[in-house]
């Protein structure tokens, strides 16, 4: 099982830079992500629609593909538990002031750590640099 953040999940459906490498990695194992990654993923597609990067018909196809894959169990969506939220609070208590960590990225990192993952895959430099504060190794194949 491999933990992907949303920046990697989007590349499974949209031809952003590095999509081929991410898809090859995804084909090698089952995928997991924090449950809120579903909202982040469709929000990323909506942003592409809003920015004019995709047309409404393509947007509808993307959303349909995501829904079909979710219903088929293509991803393990990990719900946020009290333990995950506690871990986030504790991480921020100890986090050096120099570390830039968004709340949604902290949810990814704490979810991965509490679920027993040792690595997280992302293209987000802030998430990758903060991974060590959750006992994780951040990896990027792009």
Residue ranges of model-derived segments:
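Acidic, PIN/NYN-like endoribonuclease modules and their adjacent C-terminal/linker elements
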Residues: 1, 68, 113-142
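Short, well-structured N-terminal submotif of metal-dependent ribonuclease cores
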Residues: 1-40, 44, 48-61, 134
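Active-site neighborhoods of divalent-metal-dependent phosphate/nucleic-acid chemistry enzymes
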Residues: 75-125
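Active-site-proximal, substrate-binding regions of enzyme catalytic domains
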Residues: 42-91, 133
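General small-molecule cofactor/ligand-binding pocket signal
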Residues: 32, 78, 139
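Hydrophobic side chains within alpha-helical segments
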Residues: 8, 43, 108-111, 127
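Short glycine-enriched loop/turn motifs at secondary-structure junctions
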Residues: 24-27, 71-72, 114
């Amino acid at each position: 099982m491999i933990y992907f953040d949303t920046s990697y999940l989007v590349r499974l459906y949209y031809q952003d830079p590095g999509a081929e490498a991410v898809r090859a990695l995804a084909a090698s194992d089952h995928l997991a992500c924090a449950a809120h990654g579903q909202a982040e993923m469709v929000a990323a597609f909506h942003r592409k629609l809003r920015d004019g990067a995709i047309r409404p018909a393509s947007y509808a196809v993307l959303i349909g593909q995501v829904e079909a894959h979710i219903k088929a169990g293509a991803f393990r969506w990990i719900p946020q538990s009290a333990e995950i939220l506690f871990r986030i609070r504790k991480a921020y208590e100890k986090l050096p002031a120099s570390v830039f960590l968004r709340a949604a990225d902290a949810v990814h990192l704490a979810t991965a750590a509490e679920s027993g993952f040792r690595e997280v895959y992302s293209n987000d430099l802030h998430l990758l640099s903060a991974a060590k504060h959750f006992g994780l190794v951040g990896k990027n194949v792009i």
